[in-house]
Amino acid sequence: MKMEQACRFRTDEAGYMVCARSQGLTADNENNLGYFNSTMTSLFEKDGSGPRMGQSILSYAVSEENGGRRDFLIAKSTMRSDIKGRASIFTHAYFMGLDEYARCMETDPSAIYGIDTGDMMTAQSGSQLPPKETVLRGGFELSVLREKYGLTDERYALLLYNVYQAVAGGGSLALLTQLPLSQTQDMVREVAYCAAMGMLPGLRWRLTCSSAADTRAAICVSSKAGGGGMGIPLCTFDLDDGGRRLEEDPFVAELFRYLASAAPEERRQMLLDMQYILGELVPLEYASLEMIATAYHMRKMNDGNRPENDVYDRVVGNLLLCGRVPSANQETVNKLLIWMLKRQNAALPKRIMELSVDRCVKQAQADAAGGRELCDCVCRLLQYSRSAEQL
């Protein structure tokens, strides 16, 4: 696989510009390098004493929407001085189309995280670069990396919960570590690989990462050894503290404990099945953490497992709420609700009515229009399911 590459630096008063490129570099590629203008923030000391000259940050990033082609970029950004002695960022980047990147992440994340970055430059004197021939580093085995970072089943479940929380919530997970920034590059991509193997395949492309505290990435690093930060992370995961446990609501926690402890093939199939269920309801980009957990419980029900009353009600309630998303497949949502109500109605008719209507009444109190609509919907579905059984 070949990737275009370029180097960018501030060489004169005109500001940052591409100073070396491969022949196939496009104007869109060049514009997308602007993403790294602000990475220098993480290469200043936290106490404001100055820049960390010669230190580098490794980023796995998706360019922002700017009206042109979006790229996936692997970039090394290094703090240097320009011709006027000002602190400036030298960036060497590899480019891949967003669609190709998403396909690689969906089928095998090691095809991305395993790309060798050992020869990425921190300075460049020439102006011409050949296309980058990708060479995989190897060594990306989940069991090996979990042992390396102490990711027991309980710790791995907590990591996955935090990563899903960041990706679904549009925020960032900060990995807390005692390591200095000079030693976090391998760590962040290896932990990101562990996270990717527990992610829904269609969401993996959003698993960007940075070896510094750049909260634009889904996973970033907050080093206790120094280095500035960009923004406030949504959540944190302390790599040096093995005592924390997943103490979330059982409805959600059960999913991540399953993903952490399942055999590789079982985990892979569960993720594919969950993704299929979600895709029938809403586009993946609208999938909240709650809906992802709902897909897991629906998958279990499809195997013939009878859920507890509270789990059943939660799934019904979430499907009702899902129907309010503008892009939801309302017909599929209603069919699933009817299927669930018919499936359980014979055993728990009063319980279902009490729990489901009570949930909708609470919604009505919080949001009059939407809540009444939900309440009407669940009552119609219950009436339909009962009349269908009498036929």
Q: What are the residue ranges of the model-derived segments?
A:
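Extended amphipathic alpha-helical coiled-coil/heptad-repeat regions
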Residues: 320-391
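N-terminal module detector in large eukaryotic regulators
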Residues: 1-351
